[in-house]
């Protein structure tokens, strides 16, 4: 699958913009419910002079879970170590990470749903009792050794909370769901980032980018970088609505944040299957994509915005999607 500019998953260049990320809760735009509760939990932990309880962050990709983990460490005044579920392959990998933590540190595990069950079982006593049980030797000579760990906060992030085992999920004292961002919130993020870039976007330009950002800050900042490219080549030192919309049109990102892949998927439903219902595997074969990719990457936004419906018999194109594509009912 080619890398899409509208993909909520991280691109290599997204990691290069670490300096643009907010460092405190006050700087963090959006997610007011989660942010408000998290602020209370952090303040209470600091008053008690305790480590913050373990935190599970879940929601679609690109909404700021990694940023929030860093902010938690900053607000608590502690260090942070970052890893990902797929990177922890053996018990020794996890033991090495846990043993390197300083008192109060944050351990951030992205894609925590991808931890193996054997790794999870080692994590349970670490989360509950701040200790590590490891087996030394083999066969009759094997013995269990308990290693004490300093108090720490595990922050887990996942796009699939339902894939976490119940024992692991239950060990998180704080669970926060991150929602898609509103247009005003995304416009505020675009405005902030554009100032950091030194290419300030005016209000209408920020809103034009925000409308096409699929409710996701990561996409908003990526689109802004591309619009900035057009501004620099045009020898402009600021971004106005005309330049922004022109650049986004050239990138084939329409006014509601759909790109060519989205249009191809929706049009195939309309033109080849009379709007459905049609099964996921059939759609995948028609547009030449993997069914899992469609379900995980393309569908969430189309469903959330009301372009598609899921029914027991398959996917159905909505009247809203027909109007957006300029199709008459029955086409």
Curated annotation (Swiss-Prot):
Q: What is the lineage of its organism?
A: Bacteria, Bacillati, Bacillota, Bacilli, Bacillales
UniProt xrefs under SMART domains: AAA
- SUPFAM superfamilies reported for this sequence: P-loop containing nucleoside triphosphate hydrolases (SSF52540), Winged helix' DNA-binding domain (SSF46785)
- Binding, ATP: 20-21, 62, 65-67, 128-130, 171, 181, 218
Q: Is Phosphoprotein among the key words of this record?
A: no
Instruction: Please name the gene that encodes this protein.
Output: ruvB
Principal location listed in the UniProt entry: cytoplasm
Chain segments carrying region Small ATPAse domain (RuvB-S):
182-252
Which PANTHER family has this protein been placed in? HOLLIDAY JUNCTION BRANCH MIGRATION COMPLEX SUBUNIT RUVB (PTHR42848:SF1), PTHR42848
What's a single GO CC term here?
A: Holliday junction resolvase complex
Subcellular locations according to the entry: Cytoplasm
Recorded protein name is Holliday junction branch migration complex subunit RuvB
